Amino acid sequence: MSMPGINVSNLLNEHEELGLRLLAGEKGLTNRINMSEINRPGLSLTGFYESFAHDRIQIFGKGEWAYITSRIPEDLKNIAADFFSFHLNCIIFTHGNMPPPIFTENCERLAIPLMISDVSTHKFITLISGILDRSLAPRTMRHGVLIEVFGIGILLSGKSGVGKSETALELIERGHRLVADDMVEIRRLSESYLIGTCSDLLRHHMEIRGLGILNIKDIFGIGSVRDHKLIELIIRLEEWTEDKDFDRTGLENPTEELLGVQIPLIRVPVKPGRNIPIIVETAAMNQRLRKLGKNAAQEFNQKLSNYLQQGKVERNPP
């Protein structure tokens, strides 16, 4: 698992929706941002710096801007001295408000990027929080195929050559959608949600033994692919052998941990004659039912228990 960070320059140059413009501190554009939370200094500007989150992006909205621009020069000088005594990664003024010159001077001197945006504070915080959540989410790479089947994100896993890509290709031909083949990039967006995607280089491509590299979007159309998908089920394809035990009732609820999140796991034996794509489709529909609170295995088990208790089933038939 990796915990990536991003540079301030990434926000400035790669996210036009933020509408950022650099005013000072260009030398600090390589400053790292390592957390998705932001901070509005607010009370800190009055001199209360206890628990001041200086390691976050500092957002100056209308309130902060109105306060510092209404101070007399001597007070503003003291505010700036206290504020810039902390190590800051960047400062952003929203609503297009221009910071006072003393802020520009300090940011240039200390190599702290100072930026402004015409976007309102509320909208800006919503936008940048989403960007940081996605960019800084814990992530890992996983060998397998991620495909959307009946709206369920399924990660097909298993040893190389077991038939993951071939199974996915048949599912795509049936109208389902490919997300990633071979290497799946997985990010944890919250304590219980994992998003799978693919690198830009491999996106929309599959490798099939005997055919080589295929462009799925070109062959099956734009409706056969998508860029990312929530991972809700893992199906592990395993070569069938007599000494392996596989679940035959559905009463077991095994899971596999990915980035600290438990994902439902189904082990499917692979051998000649088995129609794996239809099994995957059925597993997807069954998973949707389970999300709605319907569990066929548990219902059947309960019904059987009731029959046994009522004597409706002969335990030792002749």
UniProtKB/Swiss-Prot annotation:
Residues at the active site: 143, 164, 182 (proton acceptor), 248
Gene3D superfamilies: HprK N-terminal domain-like, P-loop containing nucleotide triphosphate hydrolases
Superkingdom of this protein's organism: Bacteria
Residue span of region Important for the catalytic mechanism of both phosphorylation and dephosphorylation: 206-215
Cofactor(s) of this protein: Mg(2+)
Gene Ontology BP annotations: regulation of carbohydrate metabolic process
Residues that bind ATP: 158-165
GO MF term set: ATP binding; magnesium ion binding; phosphorelay sensor kinase activity; protein serine/threonine kinase activity; protein serine/threonine/tyrosine kinase activity
CDD domains, A to Z: HprK_C
Family: Belongs to the HPrK/P family.
Domain notes: The Walker A ATP-binding motif also binds Pi and PPi.
Assembly behavior: Homohexamer.
Main function: Catalyzes the ATP- as well as the pyrophosphate-dependent phosphorylation of a specific serine residue in HPr, a phosphocarrier protein of the phosphoenolpyruvate-dependent sugar phosphotransferase system (PTS). HprK/P also catalyzes the pyrophosphate-producing, inorganic phosphate-dependent dephosphorylation (phosphorolysis) of seryl-phosphorylated HPr (P-Ser-HPr).
Protein name: HPr kinase/phosphorylase
Encoding gene per record: hprK
